[in-house]
């Protein structure tokens, strides 16, 4: 069973704003208060997706006796 930090990390990851890679097309989800060219998480106005994932990865490696879990996300454009 996942601990609280794992559950929060997955919840934050699921709340990501997904934008299309083509800058000429309309994004699937438009945020009124964030830059549409970047992918940010709903709990942070300045943490990018890559920074968030890097922080979670560092946290996971520091945990002792943790069970590695694989989470797969499908993003449709």
From Swiss-Prot:
One GO process term, biological-process aspect: intracellular transport of virus
Positions occupied by motif Di-leucine internalization motif: 12-13
Assigned GO CC terms: host cell
Pfam families: Herpes_US9
InterPro entries found in the cross-reference section: Herpes_US9
Family: Belongs to the alphaherpesvirinae envelope protein US9 family.
Name of the featured protein: Envelope protein US9 homolog
Organism: Cercopithecine herpesvirus 9 (strain DHV)
Lineage summary: Viruses, Duplodnaviria, Heunggongvirae, Peploviricota, Herviviricetes
């Amino acid at each position: 069973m996942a601990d609280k930090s794992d559950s929060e990390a997955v919840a934050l990851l699921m709340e990501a704003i997904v934008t299309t890679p083509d800058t000429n097309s309309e994004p699937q989800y438009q945020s009124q208060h964030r830059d549409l060219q970047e992918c940010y998480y709903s709990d942070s106005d300045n943490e990018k997706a890559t920074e968030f994932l890097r922080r979670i990865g560092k946290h996971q490696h520091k945990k002792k006796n943790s069970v590695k879990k694989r989470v797969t996300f499908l993003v449709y454009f």
